[in-house]
Amino acid sequence: MRIIGTGSAHPKHTLTNDDLSKIMDTSDEWIRERTGICTRQIITDENLEDLAAEAAQKALDDAGMKAADIDYIICSNVVFEYVTPSVASIVEGKIGASCPCVDLNAACSGFIYAIDFAEALLQTGRATNIL
């Protein structure tokens, strides 16, 4: 198993620790000391599915592949705008793929579970190219 392409997409709006201190009982110093985080990107005008599809398309481009080459889509995420359909199936439609799709909800460790699931699909011959 190997990763042959990556892609990312980020919300345009930045939320600083100082912004948070205006709406919560906290401070930049308190957050930085405990987490090391100074800023984070938050979705305001964008939506999760569009950002995921943008990242997926960039990963395909980086790998020199087309959506038709994908056998399976795995999406690991914590934030869902609604229960159904899955983010993976929305991404499938947005990029023009036609394959099985699944969302995994495992918070920060989700990437590890997604890689483990992908490896199992590859080892059993159920998929060759996984997004």
Which residues does each PLM region occupy?
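Conserved "HGTGT" condensation-loop signature of ketosynthase/thiolase-family condensing enzymes
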Residues: 1-71, 95
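Conserved catalytic cysteine-centered active-site region
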Residues: 32-34, 38-50, 77-130
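Short glycine-rich or small-residue beta-strand-to-loop segments that form or flank ligand, phosphate
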Residues: 71-77
